[in-house]
Amino acid sequence: MSGSHTAIAPLAPCMEGLPPLPKSLSGLLNSSGGSGWRDLERVYAQKSRIQDDLSRGGTSGSVQAHPKPPNLDAALALLRKEMVGLRQLDMSLLCQLYSLYESIQEYKGACQAASSADCTYAMENGFFDEEEEYYQEAGSLHKIGRENSEGTVSPISNEDWILENI
């Protein structure tokens, strides 16, 4: 039991906010990284397909003829079968979820690397020159207009000023 606690510890930091895996799943933690999860997912999917085929072939007539099991033993056997199927489905979904989590983390890292690389590439190669020139020209025109309105008297007479503003 103490081995399962040590096996859970390495995954805890990378899966923050999620509860720890149950002890019954500690065997999955011993697999090596994401490829182990993907391999386990394939194995469980194949195993569940085989068991589904076997259960359909062996009991196809008896299950459909008797929807309710005739006695307690048959009911327990049916319940066991359903529990095994649900456990396999649960494991398969867990593997898919972890695989998806890993893929999302890889995608986030790739996006962050690409965005930081694009930003430095754009700054180095001057992709923003046209916008900067436009804003510099507008700023200089605004600056000139302010200088004239702040205190310098323009040499235009009142009549010329009225004609220009009409």
Curated annotation (Swiss-Prot):
Superkingdom of the organism of origin: Eukaryota
Family: Belongs to the FAM89 family.
Protein name according to UniProt: Protein FAM89A
Organism this protein belongs to: Xenopus laevis (African clawed frog)
